[in-house]
Amino acid sequence: MANISDVQGTYTFNFKNVKSKTDEEKISWIKELAELMGNVGYNTSFEDAKRLTPSSIEDNEVTLSFSASGRWAYRNNIAWFEDGWEELTYLVEEMEGIVIYIDYNEYETGCMFVASGEFTVEVKDNKVLVEQCSLEEDKLNKETFVSWGFGSAYEYDEMFGDDEEWPFRSSSFTAKSKK
């Protein structure tokens, strides 16, 4: 089994170039996507998706916070939009013109890393394209845990013990966005 990273971030669904869908269809599509991505082993959970209504679309966009379990790292989950998970690819292809902006922070305790990524997923000419806009990685330690906004030094010690006491681990995670 792969190591699992703890991930927090946002998905922004930009419908500016989606021509043939009503606002009701767009919201229904987001809810279907959230359901699909939330019911797998390496899930992505959008807690507010169920509460969306057509009036949730502002300036052709909807932004949702998410939490997830990354397969090794969350960039691997994002790659599934383009390749490797047919049901997800087919669903996304239904929304020709959509651009999804994904912004996240994560940490993984097996390989001891923190990462911050920005990706886009776009459907253009009936093809799903994934683009890495930025990716920053560093070692997970008390300093990066605090400076990347995952929590305080006290919280790090509570979760992991002193760096010298490793491998004490805790599954609790309360990340705060870097932005």
Name each model feature, range by range.
Residues S45-K179:
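Charged interaction segments
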